[in-house]
Structure formats: structure tokens, C-alpha cells
UniProtKB/Swiss-Prot annotation:
Membrane topology: Single-pass membrane protein
Location within or outside the cell: Membrane
Organism: Saccharomyces cerevisiae (strain ATCC 204508 / S288c) (Baker's yeast)
Name of protein: Putative uncharacterized membrane protein YIL030W-A
Superkingdom as given in the UniProt entry: Eukaryota
Length: 112
């Protein structure tokens, strides 16, 4: 059981780490573009690109937050429907398995 938990945590932590690295790389690329355009066109290009960069990052954060809330809602729904007295053993196992995956996703998200 413990080995299974360690494997599951590893599976969900790696995509979170990759996404965090991609956001960092995106930020570095944008900084390089801002610097090069600043050299070519002056300060105005930097202000325009900086505002576009902030809008892009805000929309990414918003989408991440929406998915986080969605998974949390599904987790809560499956938790309460799992305790239904007329559910059979197979449904109970499926709910437990799905809950475990959603819980690990939420854990990996909270590491960001």
C-alpha cells in the first residue's frame, strides 16, 4: 500500500514540476523578447509586451484555478456518493480509486 502511494505521488509530482519549469521558461523567453524589442523600438515596446505577458500569465492562473476547483468539486461529490448505502463493491472501489487520483492531483497543485 505504501509503495503504491509513493508511486502515485511520483506520477503526479512530475507533471507539476514540468508545468512549473515551462512557466519559468516562458517567463525567461518573454524577458529576452522584451529586452530585444526594447533595444529595437525603445521603451514603448517593453510596456506593451509586459502588459501582454501579465494578461497571459493571469489567464493561465485563472484556468489552473478553475481546474483546481473542478477537481475539488468532483472529489467532494465522489466522497459523499461513495458512502451511499446501496452502492455495490465495484462502484465503491472505482470511487476510492478516482478519489485517490484526484487527491494526489490536488496535492501536486498545492506544491506550486
Amino acid at each position: 500500500m505504501m509503495w503504491h502511494l509513493v508511486v502515485q505521488l511520483g506520477v503526479f509530482q512530475e507533471p507539476a514540476r514540468q508545468a512549473r519549469d515551462q512557466m519559468h521558461n516562458f517567463s525567461l523567453i518573454m524577458e529576452m523578447k522584451i529586452t530585444s524589442l526594447k533595444i529595437l523600438f525603445g521603451m514603448r515596446a517593453e510596456i506593451i509586451l509586459y502588459s501582454w505577458k501579465m494578461k497571459t500569465l493571469e489567464s493561465t492562473r485563472t484556468h489552473s484555478f478553475i481546474f483546481f476547483i473542478l477537481f475539488l468539486f468532483i472529489f467532494i461529490f465522489l466522497t459523499f456518493s461513495h458512502n451511499n448505502s446501496n452502492s455495490n463493491k465495484i462502484t465503491s472501489n472505482i470511487h476510492t480509486h478516482i478519489n485517490r487520483h484526484i487527491f494526489y492531483f490536488v496535492l501536486s497543485y498545492s506544491e506550486w
